[in-house]
Amino acid sequence: CAYILDDELYNKIFLIANASLYPHYTLLKQNATYFIPLKTDDIHVQRGLFFPWKVGISKRLVIPDLDKYTSNLPKNQIPIMENFTLNLDKVNHMAICGNSGSGKSYALTYLLSVLKNQSDLIIVDPKFDSPSRWAREHKIAVIHPVENRSKSDFVSEVNERLSQCLNLIQQRQAILYDNPRHEFAHLTIVIDEVLALSEGVNKAIKESFFSLLSQIALLGRATKIHLLLVSQRFDHTTIPVSVREQLNVLIQIGNINSKSVQFLFPDLNPEGIVIPTGHGTGLIQVIDNEHPYQVLPLLCPTYYTTEGIL
């Protein structure tokens, strides 16, 4: 019996093996067939199909007191799930994507609570919603729309702040030129519902916003300046392609199918990935040298925080 060694065969084996091994092991979805050489001189069996895997399945963190939990975290550590923690020093920029009601704001509030002890924060909240309430509780300034100002004025204010961040990047680059080992404090620019900023504004203002975002995304890594972007979608009308290519923590929450993942994970076919049901579930990909680069099932932490924020 002969088989064509192609992506179709590889995916069929993946579907069978991933379901059969659940919940003891999780196979990591590949975008294409993964061959490895075998130690033999027989040309007929010198190759094998390899399926990367990890022990166990994704498990949700349950946090009874979020403020107490985040105040005791080690420096630059961002726990996402059990046995899955991000190192802020290895993070370039982050994106959270999901349809309305999927749990984006809940996930963002968690990340804000963790980051407040590890990074300076600049928060842009076009909806004047939960990020603003969280910031009020923690006495952090927020850029938000004001009743008697136009949307173009609001986005211009955002551009002004992004321009200041770009100047800071250039100042830090000059310091790094003389001392490459200089340690900077992290600065995270949080923009909730990016699509609300880039739609329906003056073309010149939008182009300025995109240009500033692109420059920060491209230059911010070495100077410890990060973007945390949240949106219902991340197509080219929401953020420039150059920004999307610099994201190395990608989170998709909510309904998972080939259409919903097409912007953050354009090469991914989610078929066969076992995604738990419930709020705050989805996919995560972390592109660094500490985590497998494949997409993993995600369960966002469950936590309890100050009443009136969410």
Regions inferred by a protein language model and the residue ranges of each:
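Short helix/loop segment immediately N-terminal to the Walker
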Residues: 173-188, 202
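Secondary-structure transition/capping residues
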Residues: 28, 176-177, 254, 258
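Structural motif
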Residues: 95, 186-191
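Basic- and hydrophobic-enriched, low-structure N-terminal and domain-boundary segments
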Residues: 1-91
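Conserved ATP-driven motor cores of ASCE-family P-loop NTPases powering translocation/secretion/packaging/pilus
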Residues: 12-18, 231-309
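P-loop NTPase catalytic phosphate-binding loop
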Residues: 49-174, 195-255, 306-309
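Short acidic, glycine/proline-enriched loop segments that cap or flank alpha-helices
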Residues: 2-9, 178-182, 235-238
